């Protein structure tokens, strides 16, 4: 899935991490652990294509991330493979209900309304938040917003999950 060759990222002249080489195959898990400021979030932002490496190349499905992002159609396909959840979760749509928030991605993929509804209901049940489906963002607590953000990731059924502290702020339920 991913191959990273001699990846370096610098803030101005300061390297965030040493040159990195790794491969992540389909079905594998990679967990990044380290102190605050050690570059974990930066690394995820690089894999997501939100940051450009100072040096090195990132490959996804044997094609460089640069090539994926050059063409708008390829870029859309790349992001269709990704599920991204960063620590800050206040990304809900303006006045959309939770249900409409969760339906946004599947509708962009042009899934049928039946399939969209099934995916949404499965995610709401899994996360035990069915009671939130008609709520709007300002009515939700921080933990509820986090669960909705996680549901919006799961409903897309991506090939790759990029998670940055996905369970921070959640209760153990």
Region annotations inferred by a language model:
Residues 114-132:
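Conserved ABC ATPase "signature" region
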Residues 161-165:
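Catalytic Walker B motif of ABC-type/P-loop ATPase nucleotide-binding domains
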Residues 136-140, 144:
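Conserved ABC ATPase signature
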Residues 150:
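Hydrophobic anchor residue at the start of the ABC signature
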Residues 56-67, 78:
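Conserved ABC transporter NBD signature motif
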Residues 48:
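Helix-to-loop junction immediately C-terminal to a conserved catalytic motif
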Residues 33-35:
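The feature captures the beta-strand-to-loop junction immediately N-terminal to the Walker
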């Amino acid at each position: 899935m991913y191959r990273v060759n001699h990846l370096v990222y610098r803030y101005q002249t300061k390297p965030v991490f040493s040159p990195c080489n790794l491969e992540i195959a389909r079905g594998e898990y990679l967990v990044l652990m380290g102190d605050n400021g050690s570059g974990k979030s930066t690394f995820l932002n690089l894999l997501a294509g939100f940051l450009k490496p100072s040096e090195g190349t990132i490959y996804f499905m044997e094609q460089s991330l640069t090539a994926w992002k050059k063409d708008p159609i390829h870029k859309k396909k790349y992001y269709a493979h990704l599920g991204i959840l960063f620590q800050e979760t206040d990304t809900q749509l303006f006045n959309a209900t939770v249900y409409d928030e969760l339906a946004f991605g599947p509708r962009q993929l042009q899934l049928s309304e039946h399939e969209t509804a099934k995916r949404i209901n499965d995610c709401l049940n899994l996360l035990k938040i069915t009671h939130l489906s008609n709520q709007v963002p300002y009515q939700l607590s921080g933990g509820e917003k986090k669960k909705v953000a996680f549901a919006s990731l799961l409903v897309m059924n991506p090939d790759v999950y990029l998670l940055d502290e996905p369970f921070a702020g959640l209760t153990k339920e």
